[in-house]
Amino acid sequence: MLLNGIVAAVITMIITIIGIPRFIMFFHKKKLGGQPTLEDVKQHASKAGTPTMGGFVFVVVSLVVSLVAALVFGKFSPAFITAWWVFAMYAVIGFLDDFLKVFKQINEGLTAKQKMLAQILIGIVSYFIYSHGEKSHIIHILSWQVNIGIFFSIFIIIWLVGWSNAVNLTDGIDGLASITVAISLTAYAVIAVVHQQYDVLLIILSVIGGLLGFFVFNHKPAKIFMGDVGSLALGGFLAIVSILLHAEWTLLLIGAVYVIETLSVMLQVAYFKKTGGKRIFRMTPIHHHFELGGFSGKAAGWSEWKIDIVFWLFTAVLSVIALCIYFAF
C-alpha cells in the first residue's frame, strides 16, 4: 500500500538527516580531501575541501529500510529484488571510484574501462535477475509493445549504463542531481501507484526519502556532495525502475535533463576534435555553461540556485507531460 511506502520514505529521510552530519564529521576528523573543484569556474573555489561520498549514507539507508519494509509488508518480489540489486551494485562501482580518489589519492579513481566493464557485468546479471521474475522481452513505446527477444538483454545493459553515466554528469552543482532525481522518481511513484506495483513503489519512495534527507545538507552552500556512489546508483536505479514499470520511453522525457547534459558533453567533444579546439559551449556538462554566462557573452552567469530551479521546473513540467501522454495511451 501507499502508506507503507510513505512510512519507509519518512524513516529513510530521518535516518539520513541524522547520519549525514556524522559522516561529515568523519571526513573532517580524518582530514580527507573533498571532491575536486573546477578551476575554470571561479564560483566553485569555495567548494574546495567539501566532503564527498554523501551518497553512501542515503544509498545504504534506503537499501536497508526498503529491504526491511519489503520483508515486513510482504513486498519482497522479483521486481523489488531487481531494483534493489541494481541500486546497490551501481553504488558499489561508485563507492570504489570515490574510495580510490578520496582515501588512496588516485585522482582518476577507476579507469574508464574498469568502470564500463563493471557496469556491463552488473547489467548482464541484472538481466538474468529480471528475467527470473519477468519472462517478457517487450519494450513499451506509447501504445506499442515491441518484442525484441534476445536483444532485450542488450537493451537492459545499454539502458543501465547510459542512464547511470547521464545522472553522474548531472551531479555538478549543489542540489541539482538530488532534487532532479527525486522529481523524476516521483513521476514513477505515480505510475507505480496507478498500476498497484507496490513492491517497486516501496523502494522508489525509500530512495526519494533518502534524497530529501540528503538535500538538507546538499543545497547551496553544500556541506557535502553525493559523489559517484550516489550519482551512478541513482542513474542505474532510474533506468531499471522505468523497465520494471513498463514505461521505458517515459524516461526520455522524465529524464530529459540528464539527456541534455550528456548530449552537451558529446557535442562539445566532437566539435572540439572536428574544429581543432573550438567549442560550442563555454563548458560542459551544460549546467556549467550557464554558470559561465551561457550564450549571452557576459562574464557572469546564472547562480547555482537559478540553474537548480530552472532544471527542477523543467524536469517537473516534462514529468507531468510524460505522465499525461503515458496514461492517455
UniProtKB/Swiss-Prot annotation:
<dbReference type="Pfam" id="PF00953">
    <property type="entry name" value="Glycos_transf_4"/>
</dbReference>
<dbReference type="GO" id="GO:0005886">
    <property type="term" value="C:plasma membrane"/>
</dbReference>
<keyword id="KW-0131">Cell cycle</keyword>
<dbReference type="GO" id="GO:0008963">
    <property type="term" value="F:phospho-N-acetylmuramoyl-pentapeptide-transferase activity"/>
</dbReference>
<keyword id="KW-1133">Transmembrane helix</keyword>
<feature type="transmembrane region" description="Helical">
    <location>
        <begin position="237"/>
        <end position="257"/>
    </location>
</feature>
<feature type="transmembrane region" description="Helical">
    <location>
        <begin position="109"/>
        <end position="129"/>
    </location>
</feature>
<feature type="transmembrane region" description="Helical">
    <location>
        <begin position="1"/>
        <end position="21"/>
    </location>
</feature>
<keyword id="KW-0133">Cell shape</keyword>
<keyword id="KW-0472">Membrane</keyword>
<keyword id="KW-0812">Transmembrane</keyword>
<keyword id="KW-1003">Cell membrane</keyword>
<feature type="transmembrane region" description="Helical">
    <location>
        <begin position="309"/>
        <end position="329"/>
    </location>
</feature>
<protein>
    <recommendedName>
        <fullName>Phospho-N-acetylmuramoyl-pentapeptide-transferase</fullName>
        <ecNumber>2.7.8.13</ecNumber>
    </recommendedName>
</protein>
<feature type="transmembrane region" description="Helical">
    <location>
        <begin position="76"/>
        <end position="96"/>
    </location>
</feature>
<dbReference type="GO" id="GO:0071555">
    <property type="term" value="P:cell wall organization"/>
</dbReference>
<dbReference type="GO" id="GO:0009252">
    <property type="term" value="P:peptidoglycan biosynthetic process"/>
</dbReference>
<dbReference type="InterPro" id="IPR000715">
    <property type="entry name" value="Glycosyl_transferase_4"/>
</dbReference>
<feature type="transmembrane region" description="Helical">
    <location>
        <begin position="198"/>
        <end position="218"/>
    </location>
</feature>
<keyword id="KW-0961">Cell wall biogenesis/degradation</keyword>
<keyword id="KW-0132">Cell division</keyword>
<keyword id="KW-0808">Transferase</keyword>
<keyword id="KW-0460">Magnesium</keyword>
<dbReference type="InterPro" id="IPR003524">
    <property type="entry name" value="PNAcMuramoyl-5peptid_Trfase"/>
</dbReference>
<comment type="similarity">
    <text>Belongs to the glycosyltransferase 4 family. MraY subfamily.</text>
</comment>
<dbReference type="GO" id="GO:0046872">
    <property type="term" value="F:metal ion binding"/>
</dbReference>
<dbReference type="GO" id="GO:0051301">
    <property type="term" value="P:cell division"/>
</dbReference>
<keyword id="KW-0573">Peptidoglycan synthesis</keyword>
<feature type="transmembrane region" description="Helical">
    <location>
        <begin position="53"/>
        <end position="73"/>
    </location>
</feature>
<dbReference type="InterPro" id="IPR018480">
    <property type="entry name" value="PNAcMuramoyl-5peptid_Trfase_CS"/>
</dbReference>
<feature type="transmembrane region" description="Helical">
    <location>
        <begin position="141"/>
        <end position="161"/>
    </location>
</feature>
<comment type="pathway">
    <text>Cell wall biogenesis; peptidoglycan biosynthesis.</text>
</comment>
<dbReference type="GO" id="GO:0008360">
    <property type="term" value="P:regulation of cell shape"/>
</dbReference>
<comment type="function">
    <text>Catalyzes the initial step of the lipid cycle reactions in the biosynthesis of the cell wall peptidoglycan: transfers peptidoglycan precursor phospho-MurNAc-pentapeptide from UDP-MurNAc-pentapeptide onto the lipid carrier undecaprenyl phosphate, yielding undecaprenyl-pyrophosphoryl-MurNAc-pentapeptide, known as lipid I.</text>
</comment>
<keyword id="KW-0479">Metal-binding</keyword>
<feature type="transmembrane region" description="Helical">
    <location>
        <begin position="175"/>
        <end position="195"/>
    </location>
</feature>
<dbReference type="Pfam" id="PF10555">
    <property type="entry name" value="MraY_sig1"/>
</dbReference>
